[in-house]
Amino acid sequence: MGHRSLYRGGYLFLRLDEDPVEQVDGAVRALGEARARDLCLTIDFEEMRLNKPQAYPPVEQVQRTIIAALKHVSQTMKCTPVIYTDWAFGQRYLNSPAFARYPLWIADWTQGRQPRVPPPWTSFAFWQRSDHLKRSLDPADFDVFNGNATDLGQFSRVAGSRNLDTGHEGVLSSWRRGRRI
C-alpha cells in the first residue's frame, strides 16, 4: 500500500496477562522496516482484552502495563504511539495525566458531531465512528482523522515522511484484520 500513497499502520491488542515489552517487540518485528507513510504502532486497549471482563484488574496494575508498552514503543520505534480505546475503558483505566501525552483513537459509534473523549484527553486524533464502511466489499471500519494530511504525517514512523502532503484530508477507512488504515 505504500506505493499507492496511502498511510498504513499496525495495532497491538495489548494483553494484560503477557509481558508488554515482549508484546511490543513481537509487533515491531511483524511490522518490519519502516517506509514512508507507515504510522507509529497503536496500542489497543478495550474490554475484549481482559480474559474475564467481570473480574476487572486493579487500575494501577493496568496503567503500569499500558505505560510500559507505550514507553517501549516510543523507545523502539522512535515515534509516539497512539492509544485506541472506548470511552468507558478510557475513563476507567486511562484517566491518569500520564496518558494525555499520547494521541487518542477513540471508538465511539455515535451519530453525534463529536465523540465522547475520556479524561485526561480534551481532544482526539482518530475517531472510529462505526464498525462498518458503506460501499466496502471487505469488512472495514469507518474512522475520521482530526486534522489534515500534514497533521497525519506527524504520526509517521519515518521522520522524513512526517511532512508529506497527499492532498487527502479528514476521513480514513481501516480494514479489519490489519489490512489497511
Task: Spell out what each predicted region is.
Residues 54-55, 85, 92-96, 138:
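A short secondary-structure junction signal
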Residues 8, 14-19, 46-50, 87-91, ...:
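Solvent-exposed loop/turn segments at secondary-structure junctions
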Residues 1-76:
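Substrate-binding cleft of extracellular glycoside hydrolase catalytic domains
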Residues 60-66, 91-102:
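Conserved N-terminal glycine/acidic-rich loop preference
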Residues 95-181:
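Functionally critical loop-and-helix segments that line ligand-binding/catalytic clefts
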Residues 7-12, 39-45, 80-84, 103-107, ...:
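Structural recognition of the beta-strand scaffold that forms the well-ordered cores
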Residues 76-91:
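Aromatic-lined carbohydrate-recognition surfaces of secreted/lumenal glycan-active proteins
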